A protein has these predicted regions:
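An acidic-aromatic loop/edge-strand motif
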Residues: 1-67, 119, 133-208, 212-214
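A surface-exposed beta-strand-loop module
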Residues: 124-135
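Active-site neighborhood of glycoside hydrolase catalytic domains
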Residues: 201-252
């Protein structure tokens, strides 16, 4: 009801709703990041030097972290020390990091080199020739999983760094440290853009995409199979189902 009221106040204009979503998401991320031990006063603390200590553990990547025994929704920081070959000095370097579920921010030697949203999107980030220095370097990835499986996943051959016609694998052991858990976090804002948190949850999306286009055709009835992922909200269906059928009869 709150979201519908917001949509009505925006005149159901997509541009205004997208703008509202980005404002809400910025506020949500500020609150979320404030609880992350990897941040201090809004500044990432684990992005540069290789971190040490008993709280940092090893994980073999790529893999969903649940398959490595980490049952966790939230942020996980990953680090790996790499050796930049002498013949890569002053050459643009590409980092291929397979896929990351759900979102990530990636750093090299403390400098952000890219960020991506989307659990099934291949990550490829580059550092300029000016930043490419021979010797040791540190890749830091802050992965955010909002629910379900999380982690840096894919095939080992999809994790590597590349420059000067040569590839070096990045698969294998990475250091990791959990950040902030989704447990107790406020609900993430819904996106009207078709990205981010499942757009199918956004009011009007399923109806406009899957029901309304068929109202131009005559029908005798409807039969459907129902699956559920929100059994804890069963009481809502006493009202929702009746309202849905009433609306279908009106539409046809």
């Amino acid at each position: 009801q709150k979201k519908m009221a917001e949509m009505e106040s925006a005149g159901f204009q997509r541009e205004k709703l997208v703008e509202l979503y980005h404002r809400e998401m910025d506020e949500w991320l500020q609150q979320f990041d404030a609880r992350d031990p990897g941040f201090k006063d809004g500044v990432p603390q684990w992005r540069s030097a290789l971190q040490t200590g008993n709280e940092w553990k090893l994980m073999e990547l790529p893999a969903y972290w649940e398959t490595r025994g980490l049952n966790f929704d939230g942020t996980v920081w990953f680090q790996k020390e790499v050796e930049i070959p002498a013949d890569w000095n002053g050459k643009e370097i590409s980092f291929h990091l397979a896929m990351i579920d759900d979102d990530d921010i990636t750093y090299f030697n403390g400098k952000e080199i890219g960020r991506t949203s989307g659990c099934n999107t291949m990550r490829t980030y580059k550092i300029s020739a000016a930043l490419a220095k021979a010797g040791k370097g540190v890749i830091t990835i802050r992965a955010i999983d909002y629910g379900g499986e999380g982690g840096i996943h894919g095939e080992p051959q999809q994790m590597y760094m590349e420059a000067n016609g040569k590839k070096i694998s990045l698969a294998g052991n990475w250091n990791y440290h959990t950040g902030v858990s989704m447990t107790g976090a406020p609900s993430r804002p819904l996106s009207p853009e078709g990205t981010g948190w499942p757009t199918s949850c956004y009011p009007t999306v399923l109806y406009n995409a899957m029901i309304h286009p068929f109202t131009v055709f005559p029908i005798k009835g409807a039969i459907w199979y129902q699956g559920e992922n929100n059994v804890g909200f069963d009481e809502q269906y006493r009202v929702l189902f009746q309202s849905m059928i009433t609306d279908w009869r009106r539409a046809w």
